[in-house]
């Protein structure tokens, strides 16, 4: 698995227009916190069950990607959920998986707030919300 910070991910996506960009956060995060334009929403788990099913996730990504050879870029809130999700895709046979380090909102600062240290939005990259 490759690990790219948000700005490097933006460059990667422009250089790999065929890459599947997946937001694996819960639907409420995706819709109301915001997301990059064009990202495909495939949750790693969903409320209220909160059950991780790596086989289901890999099958959904494979269906959306049209196979396992297309590069897959994974985004979550802070870059933590993408690690086990990326490992699941690699175990399922995906050839190129990219983890967006720091995710969409970034790491917590000293006051337990996100979006002040790093992350997709912090870096000023394109995003939208409902």
Where are the model-predicted features located?
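Rhodanese-like catalytic fold shared by cysteine-dependent sulfurtransferases
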Residues: 1-20, 27-71, 82-130
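Short, surface-exposed ligand- or partner-binding patches at beta-edge/loop junctions that are enriched
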Residues: 74-75
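Conserved G/P- and acidic residue-centered "switch" motifs that form tight phosphate/ATP-binding loops
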Residues: 79
